[in-house]
A protein has these predicted regions:
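Amphipathic alpha-helical interaction surfaces in cytosolic regulatory modules
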Residues: 24-101
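Acidic phosphotransfer microenvironment of two-component signaling modules
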Residues: 86, 108-109
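A short, charged, amphipathic alpha-helix used as a generic interaction element across diverse proteins
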Residues: 114-116
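Short acidic-hydrophobic, aromatic-tinged amphipathic segments that line or gate anion-handling sites
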Residues: 102-106
Length: 116
């Protein structure tokens, strides 16, 4: 099933900011999400921010996709997540993913940390 993932892309110096235009990051979009972001990782070396401001829900498929994307980033730059809603933030805490991923409140703080 060919789900197309719309992702807004912005570049600031060596940082690529990706904002997936999807409400639910779950099994139905995980493959499309992964391939779209993997393509961005391949095209733009450097640090990556995934902006969750449009995402309301994430499940284990979405989390697994983020882990595999982080592995792809290995050696290419840092991957930071920002603008997680309280429910998603809680999911990261419960699964201890908050220890694996760098998470910032908003895009500006994520950019500031990456530019340190």
């Amino acid at each position: 099933q060919g789900t197309v993932m719309k992702i807004e892309t912005e570049r600031q110096a060596s940082v690529t900011i990706l904002t997936p235009a999807v409400r639910r990051l779950d099994a139905s979009v995980a493959v499309a999400f992964k391939s779209a972001i993997a393509q961005e990782i391949g095209e733009a070396p450097g640090d990556l921010i995934v902006d969750f401001s449009e995402i309301d829900f994430i499940d284990s498929s979405g989390l697994g996709t983020l882990v595999s994307l982080m592995k792809m980033m290995n050696g290419r730059g840092e991957m930071t997540l920002c603008a997680l809603n309280p429910g998603i933030r809680n999911m990261f805490t419960l699964t201890r993913m908050d220890r694996i991923f760098r998470i910032c409140e908003e895009r500006t703080s994520a950019l500031a940390q990456l530019n340190e």
